[in-house]
């Protein structure tokens, strides 16, 4: 997770109720602007994470829920602003540092991942987990890295009339 999230919201895991602790993360306008700047967006119109933190296997915590956001990005072809919606499910497991439930390091330095299996638990220190940073991480992973306006097309290479600078240099040297 990011070191310092623009939408930090820590929960005390020592005091989780048996039914879980519901959390709604809804950033201020200033935090939305910081979130947009952090992720190279034109704007973040809205952002909301509805989460539930519950005890998991005595010492761990499982956080489930959903992140929804409205963002404005720049089209990679036309450079025009385009709107997009983000709606992502969250399920993340946390275990305390030194827990036997954390993924053990392989002594040979190799790690094996089951891409279809559940994610490995994340390790935390202390008594708090930043669920705001978790929501931001899920948000960041859902952003389209190459947004394209509907119908936008890259210009064609043409019929070869314009020669690249390297081709012109090659012609001069030969």
Go through the PLM ranges and name each one.
Residues 1-174:
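Acidic and generally charged, gly/proline-rich low-complexity regions
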């Amino acid at each position: 997770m990011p070191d310092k999230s623009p939408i930090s919201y820590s929960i005390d895991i020592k005091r989780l109720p048996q039914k879980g602790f519901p959390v709604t993360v809804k950033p201020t306008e200033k935090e939305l602007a910081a979130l947009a700047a952090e992720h190279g967006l034109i704007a973040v119109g809205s952002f909301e994470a509805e989460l539930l933190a519950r005890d998991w296997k005595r010492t761990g915590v499982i956080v489930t829920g959903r992140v929804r956001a409205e963002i404005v990005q720049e089209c990679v072809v036309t450079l025009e602003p385009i709107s997009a919606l983000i709606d992502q499910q969250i399920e993340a497991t946390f275990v305390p540092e030194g827990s036997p439930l954390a993924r053990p390091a392989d002594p040979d330095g190799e790690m094996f991942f089951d891409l279809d299996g559940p994610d490995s638990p994340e390790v935390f220190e202390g008594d708090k987990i930043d669920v705001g940073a978790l929501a931001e991480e899920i948000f960041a992973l859902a952003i389209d890295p190459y947004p394209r306006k509907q119908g936008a097309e890259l210009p064609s290479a043409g019929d070869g009339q314009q020669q690249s600078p390297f081709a012109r240099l090659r012609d001069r040297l030969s």
